[in-house]
Regions:
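Short secondary-structure junctions
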Residues: 69-74, 107-111
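Right-hand nucleic-acid polymerase module
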Residues: 2-29, 33-48, 57-64, 92-199
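Hydrophobic/aromatic-lined pockets within catalytic cores
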Residues: 21-25, 71, 85
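Catalytic palm active-site di-aspartate
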Residues: 1-5, 47, 51, 72-89
Length: 199
């Protein structure tokens, strides 16, 4: 796995503008207006509804080059915003792949977050974008999320059966339901008893 360091901060307005002009074939004046709407202080802001999709399309050529590198190394490339994962059933050189990806990222004004560059072997549990991939290639809920759900349940347990709930109680219960749903999106039958008790 390779994370891109301060990805949104380095997603500048120029690639956004070029996306509108070159890919969507808008006129330069329309591209300028759209770029002004989507960027803030010269970059794509973190947390806006448009940010993820715009960053992907503005840097589509960069991600295409990374994809080509993955193919050459015999890897499958998956991407979630700035989290890049390279997986293969066959051994490959993570050092060589990292160097080639580093060159491409730097060409586009980005660079890897080196402390977050990790290599996992076939027998390792691999944390990838909010899930764990087990050595048997199945998905598992991360321990951190399981602990969060358990702790949240301990907080709401005293007032689950109350006839009425405060606004704060309702928020806590709804938050717990959302966390359980996130876990069940990874492992379908996870937390059946807690789910039954809070429904």
């Amino acid at each position: 796995t390779i994370d891109i360091k301060k990805f949104y901060d380095h997603c500048t307005r120029e690639p956004v503008y070029h996306f509108f002009v070159q890919k969507l074939k808008t006129s330069p004046d329309v591209a300028e207006i759209l770029t002004n709407i989507i960027t803030y202080d010269g970059s794509i802001p973190t947390g806006c509804p448009t940010s993820q999709i715009m960053a992907f399309y503005a840097y589509f050529d960069m991600f295409s080059e990374v994809y080509d590198i993955a193919q050459k190394c015999g890897c499958k490339f998956t991407l979630y915003v700035d989290d890049m994962t390279f997986s293969s059933k066959e051994p490959f050189s993570p050092h060589q792949l990292r160097q080639m990806v580093d060159r491409v990222l730097r060409k586009y004004g980005h660079r890897p977050k080196y402390p977050k560059v990790k290599y996992y072997g076939p027998s390792d549990y691999k944390p990838i974008t909010g899930t764990i991939v087990t050595p048997r290639q199945s998905l598992a809920v991360p321990n951190g999320l399981q602990k969060t759900i358990y702790n949240a349940f301990q907080s709401v347990k005293p007032f689950i059966d109350a006839e009425s709930h405060s606004e704060e109680d309702v928020k806590q219960i709804l938050s717990l339901k959302g966390q359980i749903q996130a876990a069940r999106n990874i492992e379908e039958g996870k937390f059946p008893e807690i789910r039954r008790l809070i429904n």
